Amino acid sequence: MRDRITGAKALMRALQAEGVETIFGYPGGSIMPVYDALFDYTRGEKKCFDHILVRHEQAATHAAEGYARVSGKVGVALVTSGPGVTNTLTGIADAMLDSTPVVVIAGQVATTALGTDAFQEVDLVGVSQPISKWSYQIRRAEDVAWAVSRAFYIARSGRPGPVVLDFARNAQVEQFDWEPKKVDFIRSFVPYPKFDPDSVRQAAELINHAQRPLALVGQGVELGNAQEELKMFLEKADIPAGRTMLGLSALPSDHPLNVGMLGMHGNYAVNLKEQECDVLIAIGMRFSDRVTGNLKTYAKQAKVIHLDIDRSEIDKNVKAHIAVVADCKESLPALTALIQPATHRVWRDSFRELDEKERQKVIEPAIHPQSGPLLMGEVVNAVATQAPKGTVLVTDVGQNQLFATRYFKYTQKRSICTSGGLGTMGYGMPAAIGATFATDRTVCCFMGDGGFQMCIEELGTIMEQQAPVKMILLNNNYLGNVRQWQDMFWMRRKSFTKMLNPCYELIARGYGIPYQCVTDRTNLASAVEKMLTSQGPFILECAIKEDDDVLPMTPPGMNVNDMMLEI
């Protein structure tokens, strides 16, 4: 018996077949047939999706990112054409740079109107191709099942990333005989390359002869679900490991081989030791400029082993002496089997003196100040101290991101959501919304007053969904990171970084969200406890010292061993 359905209904079935449970979206004219079909799939006996109505399409993509980061599934955003889809481009680019699997489905004008500058017509395939893994226009209803299956396969396979589907309106309403499709192979796409055993043997030989090995751990470990394989490798060879910002929860904070965060605002010892190690093992990381500093002088003394699933990352920034191109879920066990048990106690102990120097000059003054206004570090520390085990950290971008990632504690995998590659202000709140739909764990979102106001409309989404986001607003009345750079490198000429802020208490009250403001550190612990024990969303505003600076810091263009502990 024939099963004739519309392209819009076919989309519902195709999403259901991919295991989609949550959709973040905003309706509009060219996507209305899909939203009409969605109506039946979000209520009653047919219910299989939760649709989260955001207040801006950019938030739909960031929420899908947060959902994907924490759940390990593909996030889905659904929007209309024209400004609806152009609003998603920042989120698509963010997902591309941070390897986040997201499928953005957008309405489009009918195929008969393409190229006529019709109302809300945008060449979505053209504008999204450079910032997505695959971008495709669905022109016929019968192509829906194939396109959706292919989109999800590409988004989640290999190095994950965003995929864009441009859904012509006529294809949404056309009827056809439904036939499910499953794409699990694309001839020109090799998502999981098989590693070369010779490369693994050579890497093992280098590691076995190393006196000062250092591992650099990136998000690829989390994306490959290789946290346990990483631990076994590090522990057998006794190798200290630094983590990138996106890889922070790949190794627990309290693991004895964890030596801190990499990067220009990372930990002092691990940055300096990159210039002293004799073997550098990069695992699922891409040698970002925020990690390496000046490439001309970076780790020139070391033999570099690079394990990555994406061949294009090999030799892109740092020349690898040995490359192992494969999923680290497979390559790490193979490497572990060939390395010899080792002890590098003297090398590991050499980190401690530098750690102590950072603790005295930077960490203690930041998290345990004796007087003066509140500092960001002490607020982060207060939240981290009381937060339940497994809490998910979400940050916006700016000083809030740098303080939060430095001083939070990571005990469980997939516990960090932040915009690493693109550095997107306004990311935090919607990403935190997405995270709450991916997990029952506590979600804490740190934002500055600048980023908070870039996504403030999403308080409406939080209100409507009662999403239990614990929002910590670090309010210093400045665009703090830019202000710090102006003070350090631009002769203190604070050009348009001072902010006149609204009354956040009135805003919170308008959205019906519990709120408390802390201006004195004697009230900080009790306010944090109140926030963390609340049942739904909560805004904790903290009045922060205006010139609170993030340290340590590697000045731009300098070497990682030029890291500054004081200004």
Predicted regions mapped to residue ranges:
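Phosphate/pyrophosphate-binding active-site segments
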Residues: M1-R2, E142, E205, Q301-V397, ...
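Active-site diphosphate/adenylate-binding microenvironment
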Residues: A8-M12, Q16, V34-L38, D355-A438
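Structural signature of the thiamine diphosphate
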Residues: E21-T22, R69-T80, V85-A106, Q129-K182, ...
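Glycine-rich, anion-gripping cofactor-binding loops and their flanking helix/strand elements
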Residues: R69, Q219-I305, T411-R441, Q453-E457, ...
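Thiamine diphosphate
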Residues: I105, A113-Q120, N271, E276, ...
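Glycine-rich, acidic loop regions that bind phosphate or pyrophosphate groups
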Residues: A106-A147, G247-E353, V528
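Aromatic-enriched
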Residues: R169-P197, Q202, W347, E358, ...
